[in-house]
Amino acid sequence: PFERLSSIEGLAGAWQMVLVRDARDGLLQRQTRLIAGDLERFLAELSASLREGTYLPAPLLRADIPKRIPGQTRVLHIPTIRDRVVERAVVNTIAHDADRIMSPCSFAYRTGIGADDAVHHLATLRDDGYRHVLRTDVEDYFPNLDVEDALTVLAPVVGCPRTIDLIRLIARPRRARGERRTRSRGIAQGSCLSPLLANLVLNDADHALNDAGYGYARFADDIVVCAPARDDLLAARELLGSLVAAHGLNLNE
């Protein structure tokens, strides 16, 4: 995988995807225009730095995005265009392998699967008699998850230590411009790699709840557990809470 993602061809494909996304608002960033003006050199130098082990990601850019609720914002930490190309090349290379080990009850950030499928799954469970529902979510999931938990799940299926080391390098907490402190945990919301890794952190919980016979669905950090009887949900809540706690996380009450 590492040879493929670090090749000029792999990076060129990733660049095209980053370029399209950057152009959606009709105005390319200055950094994007500069790269496009000397693309061949950019790709060659980036490929060489990855293969020689000299590549280092730049500080993130903080962006505060207003939420629908007045006065509240969502904080994004956005990589540079150069780092986005590397992240996209990684995702393009490993996404299929990662998807193979995910539970069918995990519905977020997956190609060909989405919220409508989650709703259909829950409706089917209801019709099958799973009419008692526990709905919860993980408290501050993205800022508090441990990237190493995702890499532990990912490493055996990727089978390439250099790829795992690169993911660790670009996904580990690092400083954002204008911020004095570096995060000790969590993953940057604004990185295309974040959703994939976030899905994998709770992969064990997904499989455990499903294997225990509960009706189950997860969409990112939102979780629904269904059971035929209300009392069953107490045991389900205890099991889910212990699995989440094993990752240093908590369920919202």
Over which residues does each language-model region extend?
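Conserved polymerase palm-domain catalytic core
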Residues: L50, A63, P104, H120-E253
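Conserved two-metal-ion catalytic palm core of "right-hand" nucleic acid polymerases
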Residues: P1-T163, A171-R177
